[in-house]
A protein has these predicted regions:
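Solenoid-repeat scaffolds in large eukaryotic assemblies
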Residues: 1, 19, 56-57, 94-98, ...
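Hydrophobic alpha-helical segments and helix pairs
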Residues: 1-28
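Residue signature of alpha-solenoid helical repeat architecture, marking inter-repeat boundaries
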Residues: 1-2, 34-39, 75-76, 115-116, ...
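"A position-specific structural signal for the A-helix of alpha-solenoid helical repeats
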Residues: 3-10, 42-46, 79, 83-87, ...
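Hydrophobic/aromatic side-chain positions at a characteristic register within alpha-helices
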Residues: 11, 15-18, 48, 89-92, ...
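Amphipathic alpha-helical segments of tetratricopeptide repeats
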Residues: 25-31, 64-69, 101-110, 142-153
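Alpha-helical adaptor scaffolds
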Residues: 40-114
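Long, positively charged, glycine-interspersed low-complexity recognition regions
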Residues: 107-166
Length: 166
């Protein structure tokens, strides 16, 4: 819990670094647990920004493998994987990002997962854009932003519009 509290402090004040020993402690813990449940997913979901891509990708692959075995906490799994994908894209790690593009889509087949499906659409556009398909990538991201607007999700639309202009 102290580690989670520290992560919130670091996210609020970027001048406060996240302690490297916490990353080691969390990593040791996660890879000592046989099955990741809701606590472990929440832990990763709150700390993913502090992990380097090789470690984050290893965690993402483990999450993907566990959901295919158990199907538990599916919505939290999808959100966590989407966040990892977005992080890979923002850090220009397109090879790792491709893993998430390909593995998340089958998880979002349920039509009631509107937020997750639209975020997938946005990230797919960002992935295209970062891969050199600038025009089609921008079009896809703008479509996702428009969908948020149509659904009355103005804050989401505004947040992703900021992402679009980065």
């Amino acid at each position: 819990n102290m580690i989670l509290a520290q992560s919130f402090i670091c996210k609020c004040d970027e001048s406060v670094p996240f302690p490297a020993e916490y990353i080691s402690e969390v990593t040791d813990y996660l890879f000592s647990v046989e099955e990741w449940k809701i606590y472990e997913l929440i832990l990763i979901g709150n700390l993913y920004l502090f992990f380097d891509i090789p470690l984050l990708h290893k965690m993402g692959q483990e999450i993907g493998s566990q959901v295919s075995r158990t199907g538990a906490n599916k919505r939290l799994v999808i959100i966590t994987l989407l966040n990892i994908w977005e992080t890979c894209l923002h850090r220009d790690e397109l090879t790792a990002a491709a893993y998430y593009r390909d593995s998340i889509l089958p998880l979002t087949a349920d039509e009631t997962l509107l937020y997750e499906r639209n975020l997938y659409h946005f990230l797919s556009g960002l992935h295209r854009f970062k891969s050199g398909e600038k025009e089609s990538g921008l079009r896809e991201m703008r479509q996702a932003i428009q969908i948020y607007k149509w659904l009355g999700c103005e804050n989401l639309a505004r947040n992703y519009k900021k992402d679009l202009h980065k």
